[in-house]
Amino acid sequence: MSTPTLFVGIDVSKENLEVYFQNKSFELLNQAGPLAKFMHQLLELEIPLQLICEATAGYEEALLRSAHHHGVPIS
């Protein structure tokens, strides 16, 4: 039996990311350091992941770079 994929919804803005997963939401600074920490926390779950975000005037670039660097799928 395969483990279901955890979908993580992310609303992107210039300063912050609004993250929603596991029936919780929180804000995360849209900066490399906080994003790297968040990616590590997600990977520690050791389950299939899929990040979902909407491109917003280029503000998603830090998120895309971090996800790619850590091997986390994003669409």
How should each PLM-predicted stretch be described?
Residues 1-75:
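Phosphate- and other anionic-substrate recognition elements at nucleic-acid/protein interfaces
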